[in-house]
Design a protein with these regions (language model features):
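Right-handed parallel beta-helix
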Residues: 1-31
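Short, charged low-complexity intrinsically disordered segments located at boundaries
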Residues: 9, 33, 80, 188-193
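Active-site-proximal flexible loops/turns
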Residues: 12, 17, 34, 57, ...
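Predominantly extracellular beta-rich ligand-binding scaffolds that present long acidic/polar faces
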Residues: 23-156
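Surface beta-loop-beta hairpin patches that serve as ligand-binding interfaces in beta-rich domains
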Residues: 153, 158-193
Length: 193
C-alpha cells in the first residue's frame, strides 16, 4: 500500500495500525488520537518518509504517539516474534503532549538483528534515553516542533521551529500541501514557507 499526502486525525484507537503490512507512506500526517497516532506492529515492510506523528489530543492517554512492536501474544499466551523485513522512518517527527512519544517494544534482538530497522534524521520527543543507538541515525531528541496551533490540529511549522532544514536529502520534491521542499528538507510532512 502506498500513501502520499494523507491526513488521518481523531481516531479512537490508532490513526494507522499495521500488522505484517507492506506500506510506504510519504508526506503523511497521523495526528490526534485517543491512543496512538501510529501503531506499527508484527513485521512486514514499512517505510515512512517525511511523516508527522503528532498527538496532542485532549484526552488522558498513556500511550505514545508511535508504538513500534515486533511481537504479539497468542490466545494461549505464546509469544510470537515477527521481525520486520524493513522498517524505515526518515525525516519524521514523533511528538505530542506526553513525555515519551516513541516506544520501541521489540524482542527481535533475541532472535535476529536490527539491520533492517532505522530511524534516520527524525525528531523524537522522549525523556527516555534511546538505548539501542544502532536504530537511530542523526536523530534529534526533544527538539521544539513549534507547530502553528496544536489546539486546532494545525501541525504546519512556525518560523521558530527547530525542525527546519534538519532532514536528510531525499527524492521527495514537495510537502503535504504540494509546496516545494528545500535542501535539506524540513522534518515531517510540512515544509516551512
Amino acid at each position: 500500500v502506498s500513501m502520499d499526502k494523507i491526513k488521518i486525525n481523531n481516531s479512537l484507537y490508532a490513526n494507522i495500525l499495521t500488522q505484517g503490512a507492506n506500506l510506504k507512506a510519504t508526506n503523511c500526517l497521523f495526528g490526534n488520537s485517543n491512543n496512538f497516532s501510529g501503531y506499527i506492529s508484527i513485521g512486514g515492510s514499512v517505510e515512512f518518509e517525511n511523516c508527522t506523528f503528532a498527538n496532542y489530543a485532549n484526552t488522558s492517554r498513556n500511550s505514545p504517539s508511535l508504538l513500534f512492536k515486533d511481537y504479539y501474544e497468542s490466545a494461549n499466551n505464546q509469544i510470537n516474534v515477527r521481525p520486520f523485513s524493513v522498517a524505515k522512518f526518515t525525516n519524521c517527527v514523533i511528538d505530542g503532549n506526553n513525555k515519551n512519544e516513541l516506544v520501541c517494544d521489540t524482542l527481535s534482538s533475541y532472535t535476529s538483528s536490527f539491520d533492517n530497522v532505522k530511524f534516520d534524521h527524525c525528531a523524537i520527543k522522549s525523556e527516555d534515553s534511546l538505548i539501542n543507538l544502532s536504530l537511530f541515525n542523526n536523530c534529534y531528541l526533544n527538539y521544539e516542533s513549534n507547530f502553528k496551533n496544536v489546539d486546532s490540529w494545525d501541525f504546519d511549522l512556525n518560523e521558530n521551529s527547530e525542525l527546519i532544514d534538519l532532514g536528510t536529502n531525499s527524492s521527495i520534491i514537495d510537502d503535504i500541501l504540494e509546496r516545494p521542499r528545500s535542501v535539506p528538507n524540513d522534518l515531517g510532512c510540512y515544509e516551512y514557507h
